[in-house]
């Protein structure tokens, strides 16, 4: 699969299959195409060449199968909306109705509270979103994305506004969620995620994926005497981390 913007190549030769219960980290330099690849999977933009399939069909045909938390979620801190209100937005269909989810508002509220509890946020359900910390907000936004009962969760830089301890707690939470849903997380911080994800793909205009080697983040710097971003520039293949439960295979036609 290829994608360009205003004639400038952004991604080329992308070949990736995401399987059930995968937990993949996309790493790479700024401008390498990580967020663009997420947007392509979501169907927000279309490839120039090749095709993307979600559950065997074009992106957009199974929107509820995809949960998405963007890098920047803009919410006015003074807007009088609670954490539960934000979560319930995940039930809304087109036109702002609950009908698309085939659940009544009461059913959605009950499920929303259960989801917040799963995210460790039940006690904050009635708090204004502006009163929550960065890590707490991220948990609320993920709870919102889970309200469609997705098969795949896409997270763009989810730990960017969270401190070190909060990052560890957050990643443990994702590890637990991974029992029920496949997860793709975009990150610059390979070292913080390396103990939790099952595989890592380097995205730098291409996607470099290898399922045989087991390379720790520390080894990358030792072997190449450079940072993760420099490693991506020399197109080091994907690392599969210790503890990976299974191997992956790329789709021959550039499917996702």
Task: Walk through the language-model features, giving the residues of each.
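Conserved ABC ATPase "signature" region
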Residues: 88, 103-124
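Catalytic Walker B motif of ABC-type/P-loop ATPase nucleotide-binding domains
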Residues: 153-157
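ABC ATPase nucleotide-binding domains
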Residues: 216-256
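Conserved ABC transporter NBD signature motif
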Residues: 50-66
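Conserved ABC ATPase signature
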Residues: 128-132, 136
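Helix-to-loop junction immediately C-terminal to a conserved catalytic motif
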Residues: 42
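The feature captures the beta-strand-to-loop junction immediately N-terminal to the Walker
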Residues: 27-29
């Amino acid at each position: 699969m290829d994608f360009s913007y205003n004639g400038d190549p952004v991604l080329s030769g992308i070949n990736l299959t995401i399987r059930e219960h995968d937990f993949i980290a996309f790493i790479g330099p700024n401008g390498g195409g990580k967020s663009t690849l997420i947007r392509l999977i979501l169907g927000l933009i279309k490839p120039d060449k090749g095709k993307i399939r979600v559950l065997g069909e074009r992106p957009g045909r199974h929107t509820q199968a995809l949960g998405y938390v963007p890098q920047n979620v803009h919410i006015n801190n003074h807007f009088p909306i609670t954490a539960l209100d934000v979560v319930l937005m995940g039930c809304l269909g087109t036109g702002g109705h609950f009908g698309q989810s085939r659940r009544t508002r009461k059913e959605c509220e009950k499920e929303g509270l259960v989801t917040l509890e799963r995210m460790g946020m039940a006690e904050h359900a009635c708090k204004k979103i502006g009163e929550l910390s960065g890590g707490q907000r991220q948990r609320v936004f993920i709870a919102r994305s889970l309200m469609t009962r997705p098969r795949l969760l896409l997270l763009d830089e989810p730990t960017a506004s969270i401190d070190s301890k909060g990052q560890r707690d957050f990643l443990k939470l994702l590890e637990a969620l991974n029992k029920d849903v496949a997860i793709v997380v975009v990150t610059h911080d390979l070292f913080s995620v390396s103990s939790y994800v099952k595989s890592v793909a380097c995205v730098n205009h291409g996607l470099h994926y290898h399922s045989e080697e087991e390379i720790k983040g520390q080894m990358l710097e030792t072997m190449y005497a450079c940072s993760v971003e420099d490693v991506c520039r020399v197109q080091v293949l994907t690392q599969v981390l210790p503890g990976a439960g299974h191997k992956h295979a790329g789709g021959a036609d550039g499917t996702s």
